[in-house]
Curated annotation (Swiss-Prot):
Name of this chain's protein: Flagellar brake protein YcgR
Location(s) in or outside the cell: Bacterial flagellum basal body
Assembly notes: Monomer. Interacts with the flagellar basal bodies.
Assigned keywords, A-Z: Bacterial flagellum, c-di-GMP, Nucleotide-binding
Gene3D superfamilies in the cross-refs: Electron Transport, Fmn-binding Protein, Chain A, predicted glycosyltransferase like domains
Keyword Ribonucleoprotein belongs to the record: no
Record function comment: Acts as a flagellar brake, regulating swimming and swarming in a bis-(3'-5') cyclic diguanylic acid (c-di-GMP)-dependent manner. Binds 1 c-di-GMP dimer per subunit. Increasing levels of c-di-GMP lead to decreased motility.
A GO term, aspect molecular function: cyclic-di-GMP binding
GO BP of this protein: bacterial-type flagellum-dependent cell motility; regulation of bacterial-type flagellum-dependent cell motility by regulation of motor speed
Organism per entry: Thioalkalivibrio sulfidiphilus (strain HL-EbGR7)
Predominant location: other
Entry's Gene Ontology cellular component terms: bacterial-type flagellum basal body
Residues covered by the PilZ domain: 128-232
Amino acid sequence: MNETPAVPPSPEVEGSLNEQISHRRRILAVLDAMKDGRALLSARIENQRGYFNTTLLKIDAEKGYVFLDELAPADGHEKIAVGQTLHLYGFYNNLPAHFAIEVIHVGEHEGIAFYAGPLPKLIHYQQKRAHFRAYVGLGKELKVRLRKGDGAQISGRLQDISLGGFGALMPADSVFEDLEIVEVEALELPDHHAIACSAEIRHSHPTQGRVHIGARFTQLAPQAERQLLQAIVELEREQLRKQSRD
């Protein structure tokens, strides 16, 4: 199974999935893309708490069935039964999507459980690219190092991040101009990797002995965008785990 973590959207994100795919051919195209891309889905059993990981194993377009891999962790499989509805969350073209499947069969193949259900009648998704913001927890120190146009280097702490940009806390004596272009020499991600790119300062203001900046990415390579997406998912997953403990 793909190791990239799946995560359900926050209520704000889920509420913004106001576009619908209802045409059968388009639904099949989306599901096939998720299956071929080995997209990891986050699954929630209706009327139950908790989220589990699964993937699409097979799409039977002729008979109109969808087959899902065994839920992980294992306690998810123990909770599922025929007649229940699985709500599934994932990404299609890097945009969040949601659909539901009624489980009509629970089977096993080579020691691994699977679930079958009819094709969903609707897929909800965000049609336009949305920059969902993930926040960096206080216990996690992710650094960002910027180089200004005059060559000065300034390092600070990453506070939030999205596919569109980031927020950071910089030293109190930092000076930034709105619309100033800076080089992001290193922006640390939760997986200990760092990306480099260019960014435009959108705003800056003093706060609690620091300077908070908001920046928009201006040049972001496809590989860096994929790394960012994975980082955002991981940060949201950590926040969900924290909320469940609280």
